[in-house]
Design a protein with these regions (language model features):
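Acidic, low-complexity Ser/Thr/Gly/Pro-rich repeat segments typical of extracellular/periplasmic
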Residues: 3-4, 19-206, 218-224, 231, ...
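Alpha-helical transmembrane segments and their immediate juxtamembrane flanks
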Residues: 235-258, 438, 515-531
C-alpha cells in the first residue's frame, strides 16, 4: 500500500513539473515577450541555398495562427510549401519546399504575425526567413500604402505585386504570370517589400477573389502606380495606390421569361447604347415597356401577354449585334404591388412617390385625394416619374399631418390589373427639427467637382460645381453625414473608374476630413479645399 502511494506521489510530481514547464506559475508575472528565433538550418540569410527542408527553432513553444492569410512567399512559388506543425505547439517550425527554386534569386518567407507563443499569444511580428540561391542577399526595400478609390471601406489582406520591366515584359503578363516579388498589407493598409534587386518595376495592388496573384478583371479590384518604380532610387511611395473595379467589356448573356408578360435580359459590362427590339409579329394591341434595373446588369421588358410560344428580339450596341429567341412558358402574372417610399415622415424637401412593380399604363387623378388633419383638401398634381413611379406634388407645410387615398382603378398596369383602395398617412416636421451643413468649397482644380452628401455610404444629395462657391445642404435630418468631392475630369457628371491596359487612373475622390454629427436646429460650417 505504501509503495502504491509513493508511486502516485511521484507521478503527480512529474505531471506538475511538466505543466509548470509549459505555463507560468499561478500568480507569476505575465509573459509579455514575443518568441525569439534561436537557430535555423540552413542558417538565416544563407547564400547558395540548395535545400528542400528548413528547420527553425525558437526559445519557447510557439503556434501558427492564421498562417494561410499571413504567410507571403516572395517571389511566389508555383507549389505552396508545406509548413508544420499547424494546430499544435512546438519549439520548431519545419518548411518543406516543393517547388524548383530560381537561380540567383533572394527568397523571403514572410510569416507576418502568424508566429505566436503558446501561452500568452505574444506575436513575433513580421517574422521572416530569408535565403538566396545566388552569391548574395538582395537588400533593397520599397514601402507604400493602398486605399479604396471610391469608398471609405476598410481594406486588409491586399496583395501587392512587383513585375520586373525587362525585355520579356508586356502588359498582358499580369493576366498570365505571377509577379517577381510579392507583399501583402495583412491587417493594415501598408505594405513593405524587402530583399529586392536593383532594377525597374511595375507596381500593382490586387484585392483578389482567389489568392493566385494573377489579375482577373471580372472578380478582382486593381490599383497601379502610374510611374515606373526604379530601385534603388524609389524607396517610399507617398500617395496610396487606389484600388478600383474595372468596367467589363460589353457581353450579352441571355433573355429569360421570369413571369407571364415579363422578360429579363442579362448582360455584362458597359451597355453603352444597347438596343433590344422585338422582331416577332404581334397583335396590334401589343404594348411593351422596358427599364434597366438599378445596380444590376439587367434590362426588364414587360409586355401584354400573347398566345405565342416564343418571341424573337434583335440585340445590338456599337460593337455587337445578334438575334435571340425567348421561349414563353405557362407562368403567372405578377400581381400589382404599390408602395409608398415615405414611412411616416415626409422631409420638407422630398417628394412623395408611389412605386409599382409593373409598368403603369393609366393613372386617374380623379381617384386620388390628399387632405390634412382637418380633412381640408390639399391641391396636388400627379406626374409619372418613370414607367413604374408616380410623383405626388404639393406644397408642404411644416408640422402638418396628411392623408393620401387612392380609390380602386386609380392605377392600372400593363396587364390591366388595378389597385384596391390605398391609404397612406404621413406628416412633416418643423424647420427647427432639421439642420444644415454649409461648405465653403475652395476649388483648386481646373475640372468640375461633384459634391456629394452621404448617409452611411448612400448618396443623399448632390451638387455640381465649376468654381469655388458655398455649397448648402439644408433641411437635413439630424444624423451623421460624410461629404466627398469627385474630380470630374471628363465632365460627364459621374465618377469614372480606371483601366489598367489603357493606363487610366480612376477619377480622384476626396473625403472631408471628419464626419458631420448634425443635430436638430444646428448649422455646421466648414471649409473644404478640393485639389
Amino acid at each position: 500500500m505504501k509503495n502504491k502511494l509513493l508511486i502516485l506521489v511521484v507521478l503527480a510530481s512529474v505531471i506538475i513539473v511538466s505543466c509548470a514547464r509549459k505555463g507560468r506559475p499561478e500568480g507569476g508575472s505575465k509573459d509579455e515577450d514575443a518568441p525569439i528565433m534561436m537557430t535555423a538550418k540552413p542558417p538565416y540569410k544563407t547564400i547558395h541555398f540548395d535545400k528542400k527542408n528548413i528547420k527553425i527553432e525558437f526559445d519557447e513553444y510557439v503556434v501558427l495562427k492564421g498562417l494561410s492569410k499571413q504567410l507571403v512567399v516572395s517571389p511566389p512559388l508555383k507549389y505552396p510549401p508545406i509548413i508544420t506543425p499547424q494546430g499544435t505547439a512546438s519549439k520548431y517550425i519545419n518548411i518543406e519546399i516543393l517547388d524548383t527554386l530560381k537561380t540567383n534569386t533572394t527568397y523571403t518567407f514572410n510569416f507576418g504575425n502568424a508566429v505566436q507563443d503558446n501561452n500568452e499569444n505574444n506575436k513575433l511580428e513580421s517574422f521572416k526567413y530569408v535565403f538566396s540561391t545566388g552569391n548574395y542577399i538582395d537588400s533593397l526595400k520599397l514601402k507604400g500604402s493602398v486605399a479604396p478609390a471610391f469608398t471609405q471601406k476598410k481594406l486588409k489582406n491586399i496583395s501587392v505585386l512587383l513585375y520586373r520591366l525587362d525585355s520579356t515584359y508586356t502588359d498582358s503578363i499580369i493576366y498570365k504570370q505571377k509577379p517577381n516579388y510579392l507583399s501583402s498589407t495583412l491587417d493594415s493598409t501598408n505594405f513593405e517589400f524587402t530583399n529586392l534587386r536593383k532594377g525597374k518595376y511595375l507596381l500593382l495592388a490586387l484585392k483578389e477573389a482567389s489568392s493566385d496573384y494573377i489579375f482577373n478583371s471580372k472578380t478582382d479590384e486593381i490599383g497601379f502606380y502610374k510611374d515606373t518604380i526604379s530601385l534603388p532610387r524609389d524607396t517610399l511611395i507617398l500617395n496610396p495606390i487606389t484600388l478600383f473595379k474595372e468596367v467589363q467589356p460589353y457581353r450579352f448573356k441571355r433573355g429569360k421569361e421570369v413571369s407571364k408578360g415579363k422578360i429579363q435580359f442579362g448582360y455584362e459590362g458597359k451597355r453603352g447604347n444597347m438596343k433590344i427590339e422585338l422582331v416577332s409579329k404581334v397583335p396590334a394591341s401589343f404594348k411593351s415597356f422596358s427599364a434597366y434595373e438599378k445596380d444590376k446588369d439587367t434590362l426588364n421588358y414587360w409586355f401584354t401577354p400573347v398566345k405565342q410560344d416564343s418571341l424573337n428580339f434583335s440585340i445590338s450596341n456599337k460593337n455587337f449585334s445578334d438575334t435571340i429567341t425567348v421561349r414563353l412558358r405557362k407562368k403567372q402574372i405578377d400581381s400589382l404591388a404599390i408602395l409608398s417610399e415615405v414611412k411616416s415622415v415626409l422631409p420638407l424637401k422630398d417628394t412623395l412617390f408611389l412605386s409599382t412593380n409593373n409598368p403603369i399604363t393609366i393613372f386617374d387623378k380623379s381617384k386620388f385625394s390628399l387632405v390634412d388633419k382637418d380633412t381640408v383638401a390639399i391641391p396636388f398634381q400627379v406626374k409619372k416619374q418613370r414607367i413604374n413611379k408616380l410623383a405626388i406634388l404639393f406644397e408642404k407645410t411644416p408640422s402638418t399631418f396628411y392623408k393620401l387615398a387612392v380609390l380602386p382603378k386609380g392605377i392600372i398596369d400593363v396587364y390591366e390589373t388595378s389597385n384596391d383602395t390605398l391609404k397612406y398617412q404621413f406628416k412633416t416636421l418643423t424647420v427647427e427639427d432639421y439642420g444644415s451643413i454649409i461648405l465653403e468649397v475652395k476649388k483648386q482644380t481646373k475640372h468640375p467637382v461633384i459634391m456629394q452628401l452621404l448617409d452611411k455610404g448612400e448618396v443623399v444629395k448632390t451638387k455640381y460645381i465649376s468654381s469655388s462657391e458655398k455649397v448648402i445642404f439644408d433641411l437635413l435630418a439630424p444624423k451623421e453625414y460624410t461629404v466627398r468631392a469627385i474630380i470630374d475630369t471628363n465632365k460627364n457628371t459621374i465618377w469614372d473608374t480606371g483601366n489598367f491596359l489603357s493606363k487610366q487612373q480612376p477619377e480622384k475622390v476626396i473625403y472631408f476630413e471628419k464626419a458631420f454629427k448634425l443635430r436638430a436646429n444646428w448649422e455646421m460650417n466648414e471649409v473644404f479645399i478640393v485639389e
